[in-house]
Amino acid sequence: MEELKGYLEKSRSKQQHFLYPLLFQEYIYVLAHDHGLNVNGSIFYEPAEISGYDKNFSSLLVKRLITRIYQQNYLINSVNDSNQNGFVGHNKNFYSQMISEGFAVIVEIPFSLRLVSSLEGKKEIPKSQNLRSIHSIFPFFEDKLSHLNCVSDILIPYPVHLEILVQILQCWIQDVPSLHLLRFFFHEYQNWNNLITPKKSNYYGFSKENPRLFLFLYNSYVVECESILVFLRKQSSYLRSTSSGTFLERAHFYEKIEQHLVVLCCNDFQKTLWLCKDPFMHYVRYQGKSILSSKGTHLLMKKWKSYFVNFWQCHFHFWSQPCRIHINQFSNFSFYFLGYLSSVPINPSAVKSQMLENFFLVDTVTKKFETIVPIIPMIGALSKAKFCNVSGNPISKPVWADLSDSDIIDRFGRTCRNLSHYYSGSSKKQSLYRIKYILRLSCARTLARKHKSTVRAFLQRLGSEFLEEFFTEEEKALSLILPRISYPLHKLYRERIWYLDIIRINDLVNHL
């Protein structure tokens, strides 16, 4: 790290922005090895039959790689003949993946420097660990969505041309060789047919070979797509992270806004700016899906739809289908977000009032943000994981049948607790109870299959200790508190609980 800081200080003093020479430094690949998104799947872990050494990480590979990079016209020759035993011929693009992992660390340097410089003038860096939680967005929904009228369900457009990704980074990185190297990676990954592909029609599936690089590229692309909302970030970015704020600082962005949007609205720039400053507009995104909600009219949402489609067309040079943006009223619309089926239903009620000797009924309407577990997609996810069949009937899991009894119970119990933890904010718990029932009975069937016994006999032998493994810590605490207080159990279990320690979506929920 000290060598890296020294190089960056030297480059800054000379007003240079060359990142390409860092590819010849061994510590870059060490950083990629230590801080990769998927360390166990890192390309630096070479099998013993390839390196000849019985160890996971081989520094010999890095030295061999740097030596080959130094060879004249090495990258060019490797592109012309990918079948040679060279850059892309060794172990199925082995060295190419090594360089791409190192390049993923290097390409993040300009953004890291920008983030550090933005924090230098601040005496105290605000602690926003709780805002990293996925659940932190739902209290925001509870406070805001119940007062809004319209919502636009948006799918971020894809696929994007690879050259556009290079042009996006060109605004940040002035090192031409690094951009050419990125084009080279695109050429190879495009041949592998696994660069960035649409998955389930709502978000991108990243390359398994280098998730860090392509996650970085995707985030850069998404920020560019959202650049139309730069005027709204002060009004609607309660949960904005610091890195996103530095991403949005673009010197030439206002020229793009003035060039494209003014033509679309056929009016002057000030009125366009007034529309963007709608104080009741809220924008939330997760993965490739975003939600734009407003208290305005349906006509206002149509204007925003036109802005999005035309801005993406002018800026990215491809046609974004208008059917990807659905405008609905909150009263009759439900949307999937972070594994929940969310809606804002209208609940009519009548209140009996009395004025002097006259009685009359007053009809009132209330709106409340509801979150429920989508049981049908969830059963489909459990079916893919072999916990039940497509009808939701629990089945045994033969893959775990060879484990010990304690390991089997622990795995099923951990899965059940994780899902209970994630879906603790559900408004209605019936679907969650059904998921718990499926996992408990699937565990019992797996144990009965292992011991060649029946499920009933096995449950009688284990008793209540078997069920305790499936209780969360909160449920165990409630079982101790409830006997001491007079509080309805059914009302307590209807309360929603949002946790501020969930930083990623549950694996089973991610299959929805």
Swiss-Prot record:
Which Pfam families does the record associate with it? Intron_maturas2 (PF01348), MatK_N (PF01824)
Subcellular location as annotated: Plastid, Chloroplast
Any GO molecular function: RNA binding
Query: Does the record carry Nucleus as a key word?
Result: no
According to the UniProt record, one GO cellular component term is: chloroplast
General function of this protein: Usually encoded in the trnK tRNA gene intron. Probably assists in splicing its own and other chloroplast group II introns.
Record HAMAP family = MatK
| Protein name (record) | Maturase K
- What species is this protein from? Amorphophallus abyssinicus (Black arum)
